[in-house]
Amino acid sequence: MSSEDDVIRVRLPDRKKGELFGVVTSMLGAGHIKVRCEDGVERLARIPGKMRKKIWIREGDVVIVVPWSFQKDRADIVWRYTNPQVEWLERKGYLKF
């Protein structure tokens, strides 16, 4: 099987819930990171406790964020993509930033 025939399951942002793609730009420590979102806004994002020790996030990772409803320059991380998933998203045209 070629790499194009491989089946990859990829979670996409739920636009009804306000989820956006983002790229990690810097690590700030204490479970906080800077994320450049697909709408062009740089947000201070929080890594929730359920993800802290299970999923390690580094600079350059593609993530899904949910902006806070009362403070638009802040967000929560809900998902981190692996490298094969990012390649698939780029090939299919989902990542445009």
Curated annotation (Swiss-Prot):
Keywords: Initiation factor, Protein biosynthesis. The keyword Protein biosynthesis applies. Belongs to the eIF-1A family. Transmembrane segments: none annotated. This is Translation initiation factor 1A. The keyword Transferase does not apply. Residues 8-82 form the S1-like domain. PANTHER family: EIF-1A. Seems to be required for maximal rate of protein biosynthesis. Enhances ribosome dissociation into subunits and stabilizes the binding of the initiator Met-tRNA(I) to 40 S ribosomal subunits. Signal peptide: none annotated. NCBIfam families: eIF-1A (TIGR00523), PRK04012.1-3 (NF003084), PRK04012.1-5 (NF003085). GO terms for molecular function: RNA binding; translation initiation factor activity. It holds the Pfam family eIF-1a.
